Every structure is written in C-alpha cells, then in structure tokens.
C-alpha cells in the first residue's frame, strides 16, 4: 500500500489562488510515496489573496519540474467531446481565460442527475500516476465535477454515451445545489464513495476554489483549498465496501482497479468554469 502523503500537491513558485497564497518551501525531495523518490513542490498556505494571479501559466520552476498545462487559456486544444472527434458546438466555450460549460436548461436526466443529452469534455491524452491541480467555480446551485481514470470506450458503451465513466472529484455549490443532501455528494468528495473530512473549507458559488488530485498506483487523494480532504487506496476493504454501495457497483469488475485514463470535465448542465489546469506525471 502506498504511504500517506504529507505535503500539499501544488506546483512550484508562489501562487495566489482560491483565497490563499501557496508559498514554496522546497521544490525537490522525496514524495513520501513508495516506488522511489520524485521531484515535488512543498508549499505552505498563507494569508488570503486575489484568485486572479497568474492564471493558466506555468512558472519557470513548474516547467523545470515537469508540470504541463492542459489548458492554454485561449482554446480547447487538447480536448474533445467524449465520443466525438472534436467538440459539438454550443456546449463548451473559452470565456475570460476559463473553460466554461454553457447551461442549456433542464432536459431529461438519469436518477443521479446526469443529463442524457450532455457531452463531457475529455482530454485527448490519458494519464497514469499523476498530480493534477486546477481552479474552478460554479454558478449558484451549480453542480459539476472533474473525472479521472476515465475509459472513453467504456463511457460510450454505457448510457448516456457522452458522459464519462470514471472517478469523480465533486464540484458543487454545497449551500444551494439540489444534490447536497449526502456528504459523499458534496464538494471535494470522491463522488458517491468518500465524503470530505472536517478540514474542508469551500468558497461560495461564484468564487474560485483550488483543487488537486494525487493518484499513484493504488493510492488517491483529493485536496481542496490547501487541505487534503479525501484519501483512499484501491483494493482495500474500506474501498471495496464503499464501491459496493455506490452507483459504480453495476460497472464492470475491472473498473474498481483501473489506474489510468483520461481527465474529464463534466457536463451536468450547469454553468461551471475551469482554469489553470496543470498536471505533473510521476515518472
């Protein structure tokens, strides 16, 4: 089993984001995970600052450490509509340096609220063993998510065919969204499986939040505004029990052990914005 990580998984250099300043303490050293050492940033959360600094950019230190931008701040290059070669028009746009989902109004939905006519935005590339950081905000009562370890083949074979099948980092207006009744459905959760812990602090609808996912081997973590709020390990009794009670229980058996896949921005037919999407592959 991978060891518990003890550092914030944010890229190098000072970042004024999501109501907190990330200040670099070190940009090299052991990760605390099994399987050898790796370069990594170590940061400290300081006083609140503007969320608008250095969006969609890599610092020199980040670039040197191997971080990559998955969104250039101007185009949807590197992304396509799930199940399509490109992106059907009118659903996803770039607006003011952010990827925005354009709300179309309530249509037919699945029991979990997933629109039957929506189209998720999926990365062209797939990833294994990574740290992913991004900023996001939702409109009032908004609901969305970022999915990872997604199989496009499995996704298009199941209904709805343009909605991703993968682990979901929940993004939600915890105060007013309809799907706020269960702790495992609130912001920061591994959706329908693990609720965020007591360290969680969330900015309200319309304000930027900063999130990160760490996924290596069997080990996964969700971070929200500088705090680790979810931690899990594939194949453990705790994980298998949560999986068996979740909406994923009807998926193929191999889904529960999947360790690689695409990154997906969810179309939940609400207005949601993503920016500063950065990934570091652990090699």
Stretches found by the model and what they are:
Residues 2-16:
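Bacterial N-terminal signal peptides that target proteins for export
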Residues 4, 18-20, 30, 42:
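Short stretches within intrinsically disordered, low-complexity N-terminal or propeptide regions
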Residues 14-26:
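Bacterial N-terminal signal peptides
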Residues 27-283:
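Carbohydrate-interacting regions of secretory-pathway proteins
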């Amino acid at each position: 089993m991978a060891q518990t990580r003890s550092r914030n998984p944010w890229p190098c250099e000072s970042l004024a984001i999501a109501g907190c300043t990330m200040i670099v303490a070190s940009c090299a050293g052991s990760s605390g995970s099994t399987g050898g050492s790796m370069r990594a940033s170590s940061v400290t959360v300081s006083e609140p600052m503007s969320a608008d600094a250095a969006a969609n950019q890599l610092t020199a230190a980040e670039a040197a450490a191997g971080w990559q931008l998955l969104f250039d701040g101007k185009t949807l290059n590197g992304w396509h509509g799930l199940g399509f070669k490109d992106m059907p028009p009118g659903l996803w746009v770039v607006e003011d340096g952010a990827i925005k989902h354009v709300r179309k109004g309530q249509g037919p939905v699945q029991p979990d609220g997933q629109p039957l006519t929506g189209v998720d935005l999926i990365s062209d590339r797939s990833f294994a063993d990574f740290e992913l950081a991004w900023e996001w905000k939702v409109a009032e009562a908004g609901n969305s998510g970022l999915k990872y370890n997604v199989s496009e083949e499995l996704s298009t074979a199941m209904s709805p065919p343009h909605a991703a099948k993968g682990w979901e980092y929940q993004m939600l207006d915890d105060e007013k969204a309809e799907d706020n009744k269960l702790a495992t459905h609130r912001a920061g959760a591994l959706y329908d499986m693990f609720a965020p812990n007591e360290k969680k602090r969330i900015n309200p609808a319309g304000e930027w939040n900063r999130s990160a996912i760490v996924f290596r081997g069997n080990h996964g973590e969700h971070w929200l505004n500088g705090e680790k709020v979810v931690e899990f390990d594939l194949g453990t009794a705790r994980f298998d029990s949560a999986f068996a009670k979740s909406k994923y229980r009807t998926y193929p058996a191999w889904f529960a052990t999947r360790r690689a896949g695409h990154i997906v921005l969810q179309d939940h037919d609400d207005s949601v914005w993503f920016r500063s999407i950065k990934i570091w592959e652990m090699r």
